[in-house]
A protein has these predicted regions:
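Terminal targeting signals and extreme-terminal segments of soluble enzymes
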Residues: 1-135
């Protein structure tokens, strides 16, 4: 086997590495996490990747018992795959059942995504508003 074949990683391994992000650094109510991008033919950051990374960055700031409940994101500008991403996670609220985080993703040119993520304590089902199914 050649040296290149021994060190090659699969696309799934590359994706898992990109979603791990860097080590969080906290200052006041903000946590900063660095990330990188997958290759994309246009040279721009793929939106699905950056929203997944935003959720992963936010999840680093809540207890493991809190699971993702929702995320709402707004793409502000195109990202460049040649530049690292900086995830600024702001702690908006930690309640008994829910946690809320705002994530601002930036590169050298400014914001590329802003999102709000919600997490719910595991095992605490929410209120159901739907009527029961007819028989």
């Amino acid at each position: 086997m050649t040296q290149t074949a021994q060190t090659a990683i699969t696309p799934l391994q590359r994706l898992a590495k990109v979603l791990q992000l860097g080590t969080p650094s906290t200052y006041r109510s903000h946590t900063y996490v660095n990330g990188e991008s997958l290759y994309f033919p246009t040279g721009r950051v793929y939106g699905g990747q950056v929203i997944a990374q935003a959720m992963m960055a936010a999840s680093k700031t809540v207890p493991p018992s809190r699971l993702p409940n929702s995320i709402h994101g707004y793409f502000i500008s195109a990202g460049d795959i040649r530049q690292d991403l900086l995830f600024d996670v702001e702690n908006l609220r930690d309640g008994r059942s829910f946690s809320a985080r705002r994530v601002n993703v930036t590169q050298a040119q400014g914001s590329i995504l802003t999102a709000i993520a919600s997490f719910q304590e595991q095992g605490q089902d929410g209120i159901e508003f739907a009527d029961p199914m007819p028989e």
